Amino acid sequence: MVLLTMIARLADGLPLAASMQEDEQMGRDLQQYQSQAKQLFRKLNEQSPNRCTLEAGSMSFHYVIEKGVCYLVLCEAGFPKKLAFAYLEDLQAEFHEQHGKKVPTVSRPYSFIEFDTYIQKTKKSYIDSRARRNLSNINTELQDVQRIMVANIEEVLQRGEALSALDSKASNLSSLSKKYRSDAKYLNTRSTYAKLAAGGVFFIMLIVYIRFWWL
């Protein structure tokens, strides 16, 4: 189930729109998660992964960053990740169409709170049983959900390590892997040249031997 949806400006973490589960008891339970979401918005930056899943006990945060805006949803841990990211991409497309040009100019929190109407409408369509049955038909061409980075929300917030740092570590590992492959290729090339050179020297010595000793 989709329990909380928030949209914020990436540059400063300013909340732009939000929609929370309407049930009052559930709403009180979600205050902690809403606070975590706001902390997360303040940590994100342009170097952060543009798609990420953050585990939070029995819940999971999923977010998408596009065109300077972060779209975040809180779901029960068992809610399909593919469905969650398809939902966020749907919101992203509509929000950018309606408010994209105004995002850099606003200064008040929740300046686009009226977008809640579209959020509620979209949320219902994604939690509908028919939508869940048709999960395999949802268009997720822009991303492979199996390769989206997964982290723990408490570790990220308590450790004080920006998600960009986690992304940098992944990039460093990738760079080291590429360097290893490059070095291995270079060494293999040198080995091949050395073998050819040794063969050439042997051939020349054989010719010299035949010429001076047999001719």
UniProtKB/Swiss-Prot annotation:
Cytoplasmic side: 1-190
Transmembrane segments: 191-213
Gene Ontology biological process terms, A to Z: endoplasmic reticulum to Golgi vesicle-mediated transport; protein transport; retrograde vesicle-mediated transport, Golgi to endoplasmic reticulum; vesicle fusion with Golgi apparatus
Membrane topology: Single-pass type IV membrane protein
InterPro entries in alphabetical order: Longin-like_dom_sf (IPR011012), Longin_dom (IPR010908), Sec22 (IPR044565), V_SNARE_CC (IPR042855)
Topology feature Lumenal, residues: 214-215
Keywords carried by this UniProt record: Coiled coil, Endoplasmic reticulum, ER-Golgi transport, Golgi apparatus, Membrane, Protein transport, Transmembrane, Transmembrane helix, Transport
Coiled coil: none
UniProt subunit comment: Component of 2 distinct SNARE complexes.
Protein name: Vesicle-trafficking protein SEC22b-B
Organism, as annotated: Danio rerio (Zebrafish)
Gene from which the chain derives: sec22bb
